[in-house]
Regions:
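Single conserved hydrophobic/aromatic residue that forms the stacking wall/gate
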Residues: 1-9, 13
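Catalytic Walker B motif of ABC-type/P-loop ATPase nucleotide-binding domains
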Residues: 33-37
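A short, surface-exposed alpha-helical micro-motif characterized by mixed small hydrophobic
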Residues: 75-77
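Helical segment within the ABC ATPase nucleotide-binding domain
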Residues: 48-60
């Protein structure tokens, strides 16, 4: 129990620190944002809130947002362009619909991938 409480406290601190860093970036009011794994240490609720905020910055304030993500489904949901990397090399760079394809993702991840459509977007899952 003690370790669990410590872990929760550390995750809460990291979550708040991430928000402070994002606020500092936004205060600079640049035309672009470069974010490396901004969803790390965020629960699903806060990760979605952050991605919606970034979408608002793009749509309403004409910001350019470049994000490094390892969660292909967040990329499928929010990105309009994906650069998929494999072994340190560009595997495919194209609009989201061209990248989120079963064959391409199976080659990228080297596991069976199935796609399901939700709200007009493709999402992937695997049970391996």
């Amino acid at each position: 129990l003690h370790l669990s409480l410590r872990r929760q406290r550390q995750m809460c601190i990291r979550d708040r620190l991430q928000r402070v860093y994002l606020a500092m970036i936004l205060a600079q009011d640049t035309d672009y944002l470069l974010l490396d794994e901004p969803l790390n240490n965020l629960d699903l609720k806060h990760a979605n809130q952050l991605m919606k905020l970034l979408t608002t910055l793009v749509e309403d304030y004409q910001k350019t947002v470049v994000i490094v993500l390892h969660d292909i489904n967040f990329a499928a949901r929010y990105a309009d362009h994906i650069v998929a990397m494999k072994d340190g090399q560009i595997f495919k760079a194209a609009d989201t619909e061209a990248v989120i394809q079963e064959q391409l993702l199976e080659s990228l991840y080297e596991i069976p991938i199935k796609l399901v459509q939700v709200d007009g977007r493709q999402f992937c899952y695997t049970f391996q």
